[in-house]
Amino acid sequence: MNVTSLFSFTSPAVKRLLGWKQGDEEEKWAEKAVDALVKKLKKKKGAMEELEKALSCPGQPSNCVTIPRSLDGRLQVSHRKGLPHVIYCRVWRWPDLQSHHELKPLECCEFPFGSKQKEVCINPYHYKRVESPVLPPVLVPRHSEYNPQHSLLAQFRNLGQNEPHMPLNATFPDSFQQPNSHPFPHSPNSSYPNSPGSSSSTYPHSPTSSDPGSPFQMPADTPPPAYLPPEDPMTQDGSQPMDTNMMAPPLPSEINRGDVQAVAYEEPKHWCSIVYYELNNRVGEAFHASSTSVLVDGFTDPSNNKNRFCLGLLSNVNRNSTIENTRRHIGKGVHLYYVGGEVYAECLSDSSIFVQSRNCNYHHGFHPTTVCKIPSGCSLKIFNNQEFAQLLAQSVNHGFETVYELTKMCTIRMSFVKGWGAEYHRQDVTSTPCWIEIHLHGPLQWLDKVLTQMGSPHNPISSVS
């Protein structure tokens, strides 16, 4: 037997397990992944049999099949590192699986990846894919008969007047409070202890940052806690979910509840578009994201991959040396995931990224314009469709202007390498060398339909409103 055939030998156990492989996952990579697993499982009595039982009888209950957790939680297979449960779910169930954010362990699993135990379960039938929650339609009054005094416009205007000349800054995860560290401030006039470096006003009625369903305190390779479907009335720690009635003043009695028009959310063909800027100059065409997993990096991509927005391809005659130097440091950039009605940003660059997301700031009780620094290797949830839906449902009862204000939530700004705000010498995002603007199409189109149904505003929208 020559050396080549010796190393290309595939054990019967590996061949047997590969028989259940799904889709067109790379043959050699899948084989190496399964081979590495077999070597680990052979050390445990009954583990191989349990895995084969799970794969051959997917509808039947099965036990956990575990391997030891590595120091960083990841497993290396042929120069590619990944989370073990994601790797084997990809091999045996979902070849298109992109991220750990898409998986949720079943209740029967005793060693789910997120539990941080010494052993981690890789049984692909102990996990399920997160499904996008069905958002209830917004009920828009057919005839606007409420008193304009009930409008929240005054609150938003006051909020705008209280905005600092420069955005406040927060660093992930240091500025993000750990669960249950502060009670929820009920008064819309109270200052928010979460707000970094300031006691200025933040979003009135924003939910507490102790929501256990939020992965903000975890590094990129750690999955968030289990996704909670909307029908589950309890959060993971047994506490009640946030009270949506706290998000806006009570429904004005002038509105006849029966006389409403339902406006449903529809998922668009492209979930977002991304525009690239250098200082205050837009560069190149907008990138329209059809894949739920999008890379924005500093490289060039001759294959014209539809899942990548390569900033290295874009030219600008007005580019100065600072911009050139910054572009060289973008590197792997940012990975954007749209999973289960939530948007995550994972920093793959060696340099930090800086994010201004009003939805994220609302969730954590920060000032609306706060800029959050995401260091290399970390991920942050930057938008939540369900929270947005709850805000929109409340806002329609308080006037056109209040709903219109929510358009600001649907645009996320993100700079590479260089930050901006009170702690940086750059005061505005347009002063940063390289940045992108992300427009969320689903929420924006929903808002547009709601505003169309509402008709004209009581107070004309202007540049100062």
UniProtKB/Swiss-Prot annotation:
<dbReference type="GO" id="GO:0005737">
    <property type="term" value="C:cytoplasm"/>
</dbReference>
<dbReference type="GO" id="GO:0009653">
    <property type="term" value="P:anatomical structure morphogenesis"/>
</dbReference>
<feature type="modified residue" description="Phosphoserine">
    <location>
        <position position="465"/>
    </location>
</feature>
<dbReference type="GO" id="GO:0003161">
    <property type="term" value="P:cardiac conduction system development"/>
</dbReference>
<keyword id="KW-0963">Cytoplasm</keyword>
<dbReference type="GO" id="GO:0071141">
    <property type="term" value="C:SMAD protein complex"/>
</dbReference>
<dbReference type="InterPro" id="IPR013790">
    <property type="entry name" value="Dwarfin"/>
</dbReference>
<dbReference type="Pfam" id="PF03166">
    <property type="entry name" value="MH2"/>
</dbReference>
<dbReference type="GO" id="GO:0019901">
    <property type="term" value="F:protein kinase binding"/>
</dbReference>
<keyword id="KW-0238">DNA-binding</keyword>
<dbReference type="GO" id="GO:0005829">
    <property type="term" value="C:cytosol"/>
</dbReference>
<dbReference type="GO" id="GO:0060348">
    <property type="term" value="P:bone development"/>
</dbReference>
<feature type="modified residue" description="N-acetylmethionine">
    <location>
        <position position="1"/>
    </location>
</feature>
<dbReference type="GO" id="GO:0001503">
    <property type="term" value="P:ossification"/>
</dbReference>
<keyword id="KW-0862">Zinc</keyword>
<dbReference type="InterPro" id="IPR036578">
    <property type="entry name" value="SMAD_MH1_sf"/>
</dbReference>
<dbReference type="GO" id="GO:0031053">
    <property type="term" value="P:primary miRNA processing"/>
</dbReference>
<comment type="subunit">
    <text>Found in a complex with SMAD4 and YY1. Interacts with HGS, NANOG and ZCCHC12. Upon C-terminus phosphorylation: forms trimers with another SMAD1 and the co-SMAD SMAD4. Interacts with PEBP2-alpha subunit, CREB-binding protein (CBP), p300, SMURF1, SMURF2, USP15 and HOXC8. Associates with ZNF423 or ZNF521 in response to BMP2 leading to activate transcription of BMP target genes. Interacts with SKOR1. Interacts (via MH2 domain) with LEMD3. Binding to LEMD3 results in at least a partial reduction of receptor-mediated phosphorylation.</text>
</comment>
<dbReference type="InterPro" id="IPR008984">
    <property type="entry name" value="SMAD_FHA_dom_sf"/>
</dbReference>
<dbReference type="GO" id="GO:0051216">
    <property type="term" value="P:cartilage development"/>
</dbReference>
<dbReference type="GO" id="GO:0071144">
    <property type="term" value="C:heteromeric SMAD protein complex"/>
</dbReference>
<feature type="modified residue" description="Phosphothreonine; by MINK1, TNIK and MAP4K4">
    <location>
        <position position="322"/>
    </location>
</feature>
<dbReference type="GO" id="GO:0051148">
    <property type="term" value="P:negative regulation of muscle cell differentiation"/>
</dbReference>
<dbReference type="GO" id="GO:0016020">
    <property type="term" value="C:membrane"/>
</dbReference>
<dbReference type="GO" id="GO:0070411">
    <property type="term" value="F:I-SMAD binding"/>
</dbReference>
<dbReference type="GO" id="GO:0006879">
    <property type="term" value="P:intracellular iron ion homeostasis"/>
</dbReference>
<dbReference type="GO" id="GO:0005654">
    <property type="term" value="C:nucleoplasm"/>
</dbReference>
<dbReference type="GO" id="GO:0005637">
    <property type="term" value="C:nuclear inner membrane"/>
</dbReference>
<dbReference type="GO" id="GO:0030902">
    <property type="term" value="P:hindbrain development"/>
</dbReference>
<dbReference type="GO" id="GO:0070878">
    <property type="term" value="F:primary miRNA binding"/>
</dbReference>
<dbReference type="GO" id="GO:0031625">
    <property type="term" value="F:ubiquitin protein ligase binding"/>
</dbReference>
<dbReference type="InterPro" id="IPR003619">
    <property type="entry name" value="MAD_homology1_Dwarfin-type"/>
</dbReference>
<keyword id="KW-0805">Transcription regulation</keyword>
<dbReference type="InterPro" id="IPR017855">
    <property type="entry name" value="SMAD-like_dom_sf"/>
</dbReference>
<dbReference type="GO" id="GO:0032991">
    <property type="term" value="C:protein-containing complex"/>
</dbReference>
<dbReference type="GO" id="GO:0007276">
    <property type="term" value="P:gamete generation"/>
</dbReference>
<dbReference type="GO" id="GO:0001228">
    <property type="term" value="F:DNA-binding transcription activator activity, RNA polymerase II-specific"/>
</dbReference>
<dbReference type="GO" id="GO:0005634">
    <property type="term" value="C:nucleus"/>
</dbReference>
<feature type="compositionally biased region" description="Low complexity">
    <location>
        <begin position="179"/>
        <end position="210"/>
    </location>
</feature>
<dbReference type="GO" id="GO:0009880">
    <property type="term" value="P:embryonic pattern specification"/>
</dbReference>
<keyword id="KW-0479">Metal-binding</keyword>
<dbReference type="GO" id="GO:0000981">
    <property type="term" value="F:DNA-binding transcription factor activity, RNA polymerase II-specific"/>
</dbReference>
